[in-house]
């Protein structure tokens, strides 16, 4: 997290989200352009979320896309920016997962209508790899069910963390994505089994044909 001046912060996360506090659109665009050449696997998908922070309240309150806090501190700002960034990250993972789910459904519909798969073994392996890689990235980068260490001994920080997770429905959305990924993985594993059975059947037919050919050759040799 970079402290720019007393009221401005930039928080860059390893999973590709950048969170800004008290920056206008022009400055945000300039910073994104500045860091883009240094990004790995840069995604053209632009997702954003705005969240309002009001200070000077007599107690901590949560509203629609808003939080009211008593006194602003760096730890509070960091915690808020962390939760907002995880909400945006979940939006991204939802989009990617939904695309995979649509592609999987197309294959199941084709299987239902034609009784066969419309995908090669190589492409199937790629889909399985994408699914496993996505599950791994989510597990590695998001801490939906864990709280940052600074909240363990600070009642206000813990209350803010719990409240923000509830406000953004982080746990519900996380479970939904995980369930969708499991469905996708199960379907692809089923496709793989079908493909292996098909390849095994073709191999058996080839072996039978070879045996019959050998038998026919032996019969012809005896008759000649």
Residue ranges of each PLM-predicted region?
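Extended alpha-helical interaction modules
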Residues: 2-122
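Short, surface-exposed, polar/charged, turn-prone segments marking secondary-structure boundaries
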Residues: 39-41, 46-50, 166-167, 179-181, ...
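Perimembrane helix-loop junctions in membrane proteins
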Residues: 102, 106, 193, 221-224
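Membrane-associated alpha-helical segments
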Residues: 112-221
């Amino acid at each position: 997290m970079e402290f720019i001046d007393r009221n401005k912060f930039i928080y860059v996360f390893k999973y590709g989200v950048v969170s800004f506090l008290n920056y206008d659109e022009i400055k945000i665009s300039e910073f994104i352009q500045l860091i883009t050449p240094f990004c790995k696997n840069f995604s053209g998908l632009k997702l954003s979320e705005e969240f309002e922070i009001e200070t000077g309240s007599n107690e901590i309150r949560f509203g629609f896309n808003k939080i009211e806090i008593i006194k602003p501190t760096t730890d509070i700002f960091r915690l808020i920016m962390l939760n907002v960034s995880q909400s945006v990250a979940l939006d991204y993972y939802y989009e990617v997962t939904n695309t995979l789910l649509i592609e999987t459904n197309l294959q199941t519909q084709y299987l239902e209508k034609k009784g066969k798969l419309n995908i090669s073994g190589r492409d199937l392996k790629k889909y399985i790899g994408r699914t496993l890689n996505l599950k791994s990235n989510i597990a590695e980068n998001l801490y939906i069910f864990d709280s940052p260490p600074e909240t363990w001994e600070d009642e206000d920080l813990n209350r803010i963390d719990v409240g923000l997770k509830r406000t953004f429905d982080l746990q519900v959305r996380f479970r939904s994505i995980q369930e969708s990924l499991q469905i996708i993985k199960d379907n692809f594993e089923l496709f793989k089994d079908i493909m292996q059975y098909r390849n095994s059947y073709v191999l058996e037919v080839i072996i039978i044909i070879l045996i019959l050919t050998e038998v026919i050759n032996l019969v012809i040799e005896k008759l000649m």
